[in-house]
């Protein structure tokens, strides 16, 4: 039986309205009763995740910023990785040929150059929001990650530009069809989970994980049991064809799967 369960948030644990369902919350509590370590592995900021954890009364480790930070149950930083300052400076100051909006993250919060109210819908549960500032004024040595939000085809073209300019100095991934992230080289949820599991005296084979987007690829592919959401990006399913696909986040599929796993661990699972 797995000893650690790692969960992506958006499109996985959260429902489409960006809330946690009652069944999901109850199932997470059941896992803790079985002494299974909980880990939330997300692109969201730790400041937001602490608020969400506080409303749940659950102990969980946090992998935030898509692996740029790991925090203990007590809130201490176990691991940190920032963008190379030269990379951050280039991304923030270059005139990219794109209509996508740029968003910069550091330990102090989420920063962007203009009001984009539609982006706040994903954060209604926590109330977390961006700060509007001149992005070019942000110190490059304090940047954890940068992301671009916009049309998927536009982001694909932007990814080509970023790859040509940055070469092998950063890790690029889609955390959603409309969000392209620029992360420190070698930084992802999978590498962060490897650091955390080692800290806890576990192996990745002792872990299970759930996800729906390409920023979950390394994590899902490295654990003992990786589960892909039925609403996942097609690219993720194609990249990991050997992994099981469960139901939709709107049906609290993670809870459905885990309830079966806890109650009938030796029986085959069907998402229906």
Curated annotation (Swiss-Prot):
Protein family membership: Belongs to the HAD-like hydrolase superfamily. Cof family.
EC number(s) given by UniProt: 3.6.1.-
GO molecular function term, any single one: 4-amino-5-hydroxymethyl-2-methylpyrimidine diphosphatase activity
Source taxonomy: Bacteria, Pseudomonadati, Pseudomonadota, Gammaproteobacteria, Enterobacterales
Keywords, ordered alphabetically: Hydrolase, Magnesium, Metal-binding
Stated role: Catalyzes the hydrolysis of 4-amino-2-methyl-5-hydroxymethylpyrimidine pyrophosphate (HMP-PP) to 4-amino-2-methyl-5-hydroxymethylpyrimidine phosphate (HMP-P).
Cofactor (UniProt): Mg(2+)
Annotated Pfam families: Hydrolase_3
Organism listed in the record: Salmonella newport (strain SL254)
Catalytic activity from the UniProt record: 4-amino-2-methyl-5-(diphosphooxymethyl)pyrimidine + H2O = 4-amino-2-methyl-5-(phosphooxymethyl)pyrimidine + phosphate + H(+)
Name of the protein in its database record: HMP-PP phosphatase
List of catalytic residues: 8 (nucleophile)
Residues annotated as binding Mg(2+): 8, 10, 212
Top EC category: hydrolase
Entries under InterPro entries matching the protein: Cof, HAD-like_sf, HAD-SF_hydro_IIB, HAD_sf, HMP-PP_phosphatase
